[in-house]
Amino acid sequence: MPMIKEVRALRIFFTGVGGQGTLLATRFVGQAALEENLPVLMAEIHGMAQRGGVVESSVVLGSAASPTIADGEADIVIAFEPLEAARALPKCNPKTVVITSTTPIPPF
């Protein structure tokens, strides 16, 4: 069995609207980390995802005790919808990198 690499925790917060692929993107990142023998923790919050509601998930790479990302702890925020990006701002700190879509999804 390959040795697990020791790395500083990198906290990635994903957010979007149901049906945008938020959970799929989370799984891709988590699987890629596993294939590189990096320690990884993942968490998902589905909410009303099937009805166009918010979907939040997190991937924590490296040494961490929990997949939960508290306010101010995100290193990267990936938002698939701009209003969800705004809702995720409390997770950010001055060094957080935010990647977001600029196309809003109207509620239905």
Where are these regions (language model features)?
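Active-site cofactor/cluster-binding pocket
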Residues: 1-108
